[in-house]
Swiss-Prot record:
Main location as per UniProt: cytoplasm
Organism: Listeria monocytogenes serovar 1/2a (strain ATCC BAA-679 / EGD-e)
Catalysed transformations (reactions): tRNA(Phe) + L-phenylalanine + ATP = L-phenylalanyl-tRNA(Phe) + AMP + diphosphate + H(+)
Assembly: Tetramer of two alpha and two beta subunits.
Domain of life: Bacteria
Subcellular location per the Swiss-Prot or TrEMBL entry: Cytoplasm
Any single Gene Ontology cellular-component annotation: cytoplasm
Gene: pheS
SUPFAM superfamilies the record matches: Class II aaRS and biotin synthetases, tRNA-binding arm
Keywords: Aminoacyl-tRNA synthetase, ATP-binding, Cytoplasm, Ligase, Magnesium, Metal-binding, Nucleotide-binding, Protein biosynthesis
Protein's UniProt name: Phenylalanine--tRNA ligase alpha subunit
Disulphide bond pairs: none
Length: 350
Protein backbone atom coordinates (compact mmCIF):
# COMPACT_ATOMS: atom_id res chain seq x y z
CA UNK A 1 0.00 0.00 0.00
CA UNK A 2 2.95 2.29 0.69
CA UNK A 3 4.20 1.87 -2.87
CA UNK A 4 0.65 2.37 -4.19
CA UNK A 5 0.32 5.69 -2.31
CA UNK A 6 3.72 6.93 -3.50
CA UNK A 7 2.94 6.04 -7.12
CA UNK A 8 -0.49 7.69 -6.88
CA UNK A 9 0.99 10.88 -5.42
CA UNK A 10 3.73 11.10 -8.05
CA UNK A 11 1.35 10.43 -10.96
CA UNK A 12 -1.29 12.88 -9.71
CA UNK A 13 1.19 15.72 -9.04
CA UNK A 14 2.66 15.32 -12.53
CA UNK A 15 -0.75 15.57 -14.19
CA UNK A 16 -1.81 18.48 -11.95
CA UNK A 17 1.30 20.45 -12.90
CA UNK A 18 0.68 19.74 -16.60
CA UNK A 19 -3.00 20.86 -16.46
CA UNK A 20 -3.46 23.77 -18.87
CA UNK A 21 -6.99 24.88 -18.00
CA UNK A 22 -9.47 24.87 -15.15
CA UNK A 23 -11.68 22.18 -16.69
CA UNK A 24 -8.78 19.73 -16.92
CA UNK A 25 -7.80 20.53 -13.34
CA UNK A 26 -11.31 19.89 -12.09
CA UNK A 27 -11.41 16.57 -13.95
CA UNK A 28 -8.19 15.57 -12.15
CA UNK A 29 -9.67 16.52 -8.79
CA UNK A 30 -12.64 14.24 -9.45
CA UNK A 31 -10.37 11.50 -10.84
CA UNK A 32 -8.04 11.29 -7.83
CA UNK A 33 -10.04 12.65 -4.91
CA UNK A 34 -13.62 11.89 -5.93
CA UNK A 35 -15.86 9.24 -4.37
CA UNK A 36 -14.83 6.73 -7.01
CA UNK A 37 -11.17 7.76 -7.11
CA UNK A 38 -8.09 5.76 -6.02
CA UNK A 39 -7.73 7.68 -2.77
CA UNK A 40 -11.19 6.61 -1.70
CA UNK A 41 -10.42 3.01 -2.64
CA UNK A 42 -7.19 3.06 -0.61
CA UNK A 43 -9.02 4.43 2.44
CA UNK A 44 -11.54 1.59 2.15
CA UNK A 45 -8.70 -0.97 2.27
CA UNK A 46 -7.38 0.33 5.58
CA UNK A 47 -9.62 -2.09 7.45
CA UNK A 48 -7.69 -5.03 5.99
CA UNK A 49 -4.39 -3.91 7.48
CA UNK A 50 -3.01 -5.14 10.77
CA UNK A 51 -3.41 -3.03 13.88
CA UNK A 52 0.28 -2.07 13.67
CA UNK A 53 0.19 -0.98 9.98
CA UNK A 54 -3.17 0.80 10.04
CA UNK A 55 -2.11 4.02 11.91
CA UNK A 56 1.01 4.42 9.80
CA UNK A 57 -0.78 3.89 6.47
CA UNK A 58 -3.73 6.04 7.57
CA UNK A 59 -1.45 8.94 8.41
CA UNK A 60 0.41 8.55 5.10
CA UNK A 61 -2.86 8.42 3.14
CA UNK A 62 -4.05 11.63 4.80
CA UNK A 63 -0.73 13.30 3.94
CA UNK A 64 -1.12 12.28 0.29
CA UNK A 65 -4.74 13.56 0.17
CA UNK A 66 -3.69 16.86 1.78
CA UNK A 67 -0.73 17.22 -0.61
CA UNK A 68 -2.93 16.62 -3.67
CA UNK A 69 -5.63 19.01 -2.39
CA UNK A 70 -3.03 21.75 -1.87
CA UNK A 71 -1.46 21.08 -5.26
CA UNK A 72 -4.86 21.40 -6.96
CA UNK A 73 -5.66 24.60 -5.04
CA UNK A 74 -2.30 26.14 -5.90
CA UNK A 75 -2.62 25.19 -9.57
CA UNK A 76 -6.19 26.58 -9.62
CA UNK A 77 -4.97 29.98 -8.45
CA UNK A 78 -2.30 29.98 -11.15
CA UNK A 79 -4.77 29.05 -13.89
CA UNK A 80 -7.37 31.60 -12.70
CA UNK A 81 -4.75 34.36 -12.74
CA UNK A 82 -3.65 33.32 -16.23
CA UNK A 83 -7.29 33.31 -17.40
CA UNK A 84 -7.88 36.82 -16.03
CA UNK A 85 -4.68 38.13 -17.63
CA UNK A 86 -5.62 36.56 -20.96
CA UNK A 87 -9.09 38.10 -20.78
CA UNK A 88 -7.68 41.52 -19.94
CA UNK A 89 -5.22 41.19 -22.80
CA UNK A 90 -7.94 40.28 -25.30
CA UNK A 91 -10.36 42.95 -24.03
CA UNK A 92 -7.94 45.83 -23.80
CA UNK A 93 -9.65 49.21 -24.22
CA UNK A 94 -7.89 51.86 -26.23
CA UNK A 95 -8.43 54.91 -24.02
CA UNK A 96 -7.31 57.17 -26.85
CA UNK A 97 -10.42 56.32 -28.90
CA UNK A 98 -13.23 58.91 -28.85
CA UNK A 99 -15.89 58.17 -26.24
CA UNK A 100 -19.61 57.76 -26.77
CA UNK A 101 -21.26 61.10 -26.09
CA UNK A 102 -24.24 61.11 -23.70
CA UNK A 103 -27.65 61.86 -25.14
CA UNK A 104 -28.41 65.56 -24.96
CA UNK A 105 -31.95 66.82 -24.60
CA UNK A 106 -33.20 70.32 -25.39
CA UNK A 107 -36.35 72.18 -24.55
CA UNK A 108 -39.42 71.24 -26.58
CA UNK A 109 -40.61 73.74 -29.17
CA UNK A 110 -43.76 74.51 -27.15
CA UNK A 111 -41.71 75.09 -24.02
CA UNK A 112 -39.46 77.48 -25.93
CA UNK A 113 -42.45 79.49 -27.21
CA UNK A 114 -44.14 79.60 -23.79
CA UNK A 115 -40.95 80.69 -22.02
CA UNK A 116 -40.29 83.34 -24.66
CA UNK A 117 -43.71 84.86 -23.98
CA UNK A 118 -43.31 84.50 -20.21
CA UNK A 119 -39.97 86.30 -20.31
CA UNK A 120 -41.48 89.11 -22.35
CA UNK A 121 -44.38 89.66 -19.95
CA UNK A 122 -42.20 89.35 -16.85
CA UNK A 123 -40.08 92.11 -18.37
CA UNK A 124 -43.26 94.21 -18.59
CA UNK A 125 -43.98 93.74 -14.89
CA UNK A 126 -46.38 90.80 -15.08
CA UNK A 127 -46.44 87.88 -12.66
CA UNK A 128 -47.19 84.25 -13.54
CA UNK A 129 -50.36 82.85 -11.97
CA UNK A 130 -51.38 79.20 -12.03
CA UNK A 131 -54.47 77.25 -11.01
CA UNK A 132 -56.01 73.76 -11.01
CA UNK A 133 -56.66 71.90 -14.25
CA UNK A 134 -59.63 70.16 -12.62
CA UNK A 135 -61.83 73.21 -12.06
CA UNK A 136 -65.17 74.10 -10.55
CA UNK A 137 -67.93 74.91 -13.01
CA UNK A 138 -68.37 78.22 -11.20
CA UNK A 139 -64.86 79.50 -11.95
CA UNK A 140 -64.74 78.06 -15.45
CA UNK A 141 -68.06 79.60 -16.52
CA UNK A 142 -70.24 81.50 -14.05
CA UNK A 143 -67.52 83.76 -12.65
CA UNK A 144 -66.67 84.66 -16.27
CA UNK A 145 -70.17 85.89 -17.14
CA UNK A 146 -71.27 82.51 -18.50
CA UNK A 147 -74.24 81.51 -16.31
CA UNK A 148 -75.88 78.12 -16.64
CA UNK A 149 -77.71 77.64 -19.97
CA UNK A 150 -75.75 80.51 -21.55
CA UNK A 151 -75.51 79.73 -25.32
CA UNK A 152 -71.79 80.53 -25.38
CA UNK A 153 -71.14 77.42 -23.28
CA UNK A 154 -71.86 75.35 -26.39
CA UNK A 155 -68.74 76.89 -27.95
CA UNK A 156 -66.62 75.00 -25.41
CA UNK A 157 -67.77 71.38 -25.29
CA UNK A 158 -66.36 70.22 -21.98
CA UNK A 159 -65.04 67.16 -20.17
CA UNK A 160 -67.17 67.02 -17.02
CA UNK A 161 -65.98 64.90 -14.10
CA UNK A 162 -68.96 65.53 -11.85
CA UNK A 163 -71.94 67.85 -12.20
CA UNK A 164 -69.90 70.74 -10.78
CA UNK A 165 -66.31 69.89 -11.76
CA UNK A 166 -64.64 69.61 -15.15
CA UNK A 167 -61.32 69.81 -16.91
CA UNK A 168 -60.91 73.53 -17.49
CA UNK A 169 -61.64 74.70 -21.03
CA UNK A 170 -59.49 77.83 -20.65
CA UNK A 171 -57.04 79.34 -18.18
CA UNK A 172 -59.48 82.19 -17.47
CA UNK A 173 -60.54 80.57 -14.15
CA UNK A 174 -57.08 81.49 -12.86
CA UNK A 175 -57.92 85.12 -13.59
CA UNK A 176 -61.19 84.85 -11.63
CA UNK A 177 -59.39 83.31 -8.65
CA UNK A 178 -56.69 85.98 -8.84
CA UNK A 179 -59.24 88.81 -8.85
CA UNK A 180 -61.09 87.33 -5.87
CA UNK A 181 -58.09 87.38 -3.58
CA UNK A 182 -56.24 90.46 -4.84
CA UNK A 183 -55.49 93.38 -2.52
CA UNK A 184 -55.47 96.57 -4.61
CA UNK A 185 -53.67 98.45 -1.85
CA UNK A 186 -50.59 96.59 -3.10
CA UNK A 187 -51.06 97.72 -6.70
CA UNK A 188 -52.96 96.62 -9.82
CA UNK A 189 -53.33 93.07 -11.08
CA UNK A 190 -50.85 92.18 -13.83
CA UNK A 191 -50.70 88.44 -14.46
CA UNK A 192 -50.37 85.92 -17.24
CA UNK A 193 -51.87 82.46 -16.83
CA UNK A 194 -50.15 79.71 -18.85
CA UNK A 195 -51.35 76.12 -18.69
CA UNK A 196 -53.04 73.12 -20.24
CA UNK A 197 -56.72 73.25 -21.19
CA UNK A 198 -59.15 70.61 -22.44
CA UNK A 199 -62.05 70.59 -24.91
CA UNK A 200 -63.99 67.83 -26.59
CA UNK A 201 -62.59 68.50 -30.04
CA UNK A 202 -61.85 65.84 -32.62
CA UNK A 203 -58.09 65.72 -33.12
CA UNK A 204 -56.99 66.85 -36.57
CA UNK A 205 -54.32 69.07 -38.11
CA UNK A 206 -55.51 72.19 -36.29
CA UNK A 207 -57.46 70.86 -33.29
CA UNK A 208 -56.56 68.88 -30.19
CA UNK A 209 -58.58 67.74 -27.19
CA UNK A 210 -55.73 69.02 -24.99
CA UNK A 211 -53.65 72.09 -25.74
CA UNK A 212 -52.07 75.07 -23.98
CA UNK A 213 -53.15 78.65 -23.47
CA UNK A 214 -51.58 81.81 -22.17
CA UNK A 215 -54.06 84.38 -20.95
CA UNK A 216 -53.24 87.80 -19.60
CA UNK A 217 -55.11 90.06 -17.20
CA UNK A 218 -54.57 93.63 -16.06
CA UNK A 219 -56.98 95.29 -13.61
CA UNK A 220 -56.49 98.60 -11.88
CA UNK A 221 -57.61 102.20 -11.87
CA UNK A 222 -57.76 104.04 -15.21
CA UNK A 223 -56.89 101.00 -17.34
CA UNK A 224 -58.00 101.81 -20.90
CA UNK A 225 -58.32 100.21 -24.31
CA UNK A 226 -55.16 102.09 -25.29
CA UNK A 227 -53.25 100.07 -22.68
CA UNK A 228 -54.57 96.87 -24.25
CA UNK A 229 -53.56 97.95 -27.74
CA UNK A 230 -50.08 98.91 -26.57
CA UNK A 231 -49.61 95.56 -24.86
CA UNK A 232 -50.77 93.62 -27.92
CA UNK A 233 -48.45 95.65 -30.14
CA UNK A 234 -45.46 94.73 -27.98
CA UNK A 235 -46.54 91.08 -28.03
CA UNK A 236 -46.86 91.01 -31.83
CA UNK A 237 -43.51 92.69 -32.45
CA UNK A 238 -41.66 90.55 -29.89
CA UNK A 239 -43.00 87.23 -31.13
CA UNK A 240 -43.21 87.91 -34.87
CA UNK A 241 -40.78 90.75 -35.64
CA UNK A 242 -40.51 94.50 -35.17
CA UNK A 243 -41.97 95.22 -38.61
CA UNK A 244 -45.32 93.65 -37.71
CA UNK A 245 -48.47 95.77 -37.82
CA UNK A 246 -51.57 94.85 -35.84
CA UNK A 247 -55.25 95.09 -36.70
CA UNK A 248 -58.08 94.88 -34.15
CA UNK A 249 -61.46 93.55 -35.31
CA UNK A 250 -64.69 93.71 -33.28
CA UNK A 251 -65.70 90.34 -31.85
CA UNK A 252 -67.68 88.81 -29.00
CA UNK A 253 -66.53 87.13 -25.80
CA UNK A 254 -68.86 86.87 -22.78
CA UNK A 255 -66.16 87.98 -20.34
CA UNK A 256 -65.01 91.14 -22.18
CA UNK A 257 -66.80 94.22 -23.49
CA UNK A 258 -65.83 95.56 -25.95
CA UNK A 259 -64.16 92.47 -27.41
CA UNK A 260 -61.68 92.38 -30.28
CA UNK A 261 -59.58 89.87 -32.17
CA UNK A 262 -56.04 90.81 -33.09
CA UNK A 263 -54.54 90.13 -36.50
CA UNK A 264 -50.93 90.74 -37.46
CA UNK A 265 -49.57 91.66 -40.86
CA UNK A 266 -48.37 88.49 -42.55
CA UNK A 267 -44.71 87.83 -41.76
CA UNK A 268 -44.43 85.61 -44.84
CA UNK A 269 -45.51 88.02 -47.57
CA UNK A 270 -45.38 91.35 -45.74
CA UNK A 271 -49.11 91.89 -46.25
CA UNK A 272 -49.21 91.26 -49.99
CA UNK A 273 -51.19 88.03 -49.71
CA UNK A 274 -49.97 84.44 -49.69
CA UNK A 275 -50.91 80.90 -48.69
CA UNK A 276 -50.08 81.52 -45.01
CA UNK A 277 -52.45 84.49 -44.70
CA UNK A 278 -54.93 83.01 -47.20
CA UNK A 279 -54.44 85.96 -49.50
CA UNK A 280 -55.64 88.57 -46.99
CA UNK A 281 -52.29 89.92 -45.84
CA UNK A 282 -53.35 89.37 -42.19
CA UNK A 283 -53.11 86.46 -39.74
CA UNK A 284 -55.46 86.01 -36.78
CA UNK A 285 -53.53 85.60 -33.53
CA UNK A 286 -55.66 86.09 -30.41
CA UNK A 287 -58.83 87.31 -28.76
CA UNK A 288 -58.98 90.13 -26.21
CA UNK A 289 -61.04 92.95 -24.78
CA UNK A 290 -61.87 95.06 -21.75
CA UNK A 291 -62.93 92.99 -18.74
CA UNK A 292 -66.73 92.90 -18.53
CA UNK A 293 -68.13 94.78 -15.50
CA UNK A 294 -70.09 91.66 -14.53
CA UNK A 295 -66.84 89.69 -14.26
CA UNK A 296 -65.32 92.35 -12.02
CA UNK A 297 -68.38 92.45 -9.78
CA UNK A 298 -68.53 88.62 -9.54
CA UNK A 299 -65.00 88.77 -8.12
CA UNK A 300 -65.89 91.47 -5.61
CA UNK A 301 -64.24 94.32 -7.53
CA UNK A 302 -65.98 97.70 -7.84
CA UNK A 303 -66.44 98.11 -11.60
CA UNK A 304 -67.11 101.85 -11.20
CA UNK A 305 -63.60 102.34 -9.81
CA UNK A 306 -61.55 99.64 -11.47
CA UNK A 307 -61.26 98.53 -15.08
CA UNK A 308 -59.06 96.12 -16.93
CA UNK A 309 -58.27 94.18 -20.04
CA UNK A 310 -57.70 90.52 -20.83
CA UNK A 311 -56.33 88.53 -23.74
CA UNK A 312 -55.65 84.92 -24.58
CA UNK A 313 -53.69 83.03 -27.21
CA UNK A 314 -52.46 79.52 -27.92
CA UNK A 315 -48.72 78.79 -27.90
CA UNK A 316 -49.38 75.95 -30.37
CA UNK A 317 -50.74 78.42 -32.92
CA UNK A 318 -47.80 80.76 -32.38
CA UNK A 319 -45.34 77.88 -32.80
CA UNK A 320 -47.10 76.59 -35.91
CA UNK A 321 -47.07 80.03 -37.52
CA UNK A 322 -43.50 80.96 -36.59
CA UNK A 323 -41.97 77.63 -37.56
CA UNK A 324 -44.26 76.54 -40.42
CA UNK A 325 -45.61 73.48 -38.60
CA UNK A 326 -48.55 72.19 -40.64
CA UNK A 327 -50.08 69.79 -38.10
CA UNK A 328 -50.63 70.42 -34.38
CA UNK A 329 -50.21 66.70 -33.74
CA UNK A 330 -46.50 66.98 -34.56
CA UNK A 331 -46.14 68.90 -31.30
CA UNK A 332 -47.39 65.96 -29.24
CA UNK A 333 -46.22 62.76 -30.97
CA UNK A 334 -42.65 62.94 -29.57
CA UNK A 335 -41.07 62.14 -32.93
CA UNK A 336 -37.38 63.01 -32.52
CA UNK A 337 -37.08 63.63 -36.27
CA UNK A 338 -39.44 66.56 -35.70
CA UNK A 339 -38.37 67.81 -32.28
CA UNK A 340 -34.64 67.84 -33.12
CA UNK A 341 -35.32 70.48 -35.78
CA UNK A 342 -36.05 73.01 -33.02
CA UNK A 343 -33.19 72.47 -30.59
CA UNK A 344 -32.75 75.37 -28.21
CA UNK A 345 -29.38 76.59 -26.95
CA UNK A 346 -30.35 75.58 -23.40
CA UNK A 347 -29.57 71.88 -23.06
CA UNK A 348 -29.41 69.26 -20.37
CA UNK A 349 -28.41 65.62 -20.25
CA UNK A 350 -31.27 63.16 -20.54
Amino acid sequence: MLEQLQTLKSEAETQINEASDLKTLNDLRVKYLGKKGPMTEIMKQMGKLSAEERPKMGSLANEVRTALTEAISSKQQILETEAINEKLKSETIDVTLPGTAPSIGTKHLLTQVIEEMEDMFIGMGYEIAEGPEVELDYYNFEALNLPKDHPARDMQDSFYITENTLLRTQTSPVQARTMEKHDFSKGPIKVICPGKVYRRDNDDATHSHQFTQIEGLVVGENITFADLKGTLTVLAKTMFGEEREIRLRPSFFPFTEPSVEMDISCFKCGGKGCRVCKGTGWIEILGSGMVHPNVLEMSGIDSTRYSGFAFGLGPERVAMLKYAVDDIRHLYTNDLRFTKQFQSTETGEI
